[in-house]
Amino acid sequence: MAIVKIINSPRSQNLKGLHGVLAYCCRDAKTTHEGRKLITGINCVPQIALQEFMNTKRLHGQTGGRMYYHMVQSFPPEETITPESAHEIAVKLAASIPGFEIVVATHRDAHHVHSHFVINSVSFETGKKYHS
């Protein structure tokens, strides 16, 4: 059974932190499996997510405070799951959070398969901040 954790980081308060978490989560070496990149954007394009997140914040006057939420969904090492299946589950979970731009990136490089979620702290629909 998968578990989901919120990763609290002081870096979530600034643009440099947002850039860093997106770069880390989307690295080819961690997300490529059998020639396929396990990266999906929910309400955004992963390659330009930083710009899209910031455009949403500027549009709604929400450029201060927390920039993003970083969550990780992981499976125990003894659970047999393919990276593709883990990614599909992660994308479904992310899609259940309406109104937010989310990058989902599944890593297959550790002892267990896990997926990262980088969620814009501001809703593109309402302009309000996400509260976990």
Residue ranges and their predicted role:
Residues M1-S132:
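N-terminal nicking endonuclease/strand-transfer module with a His-rich metal-binding environment
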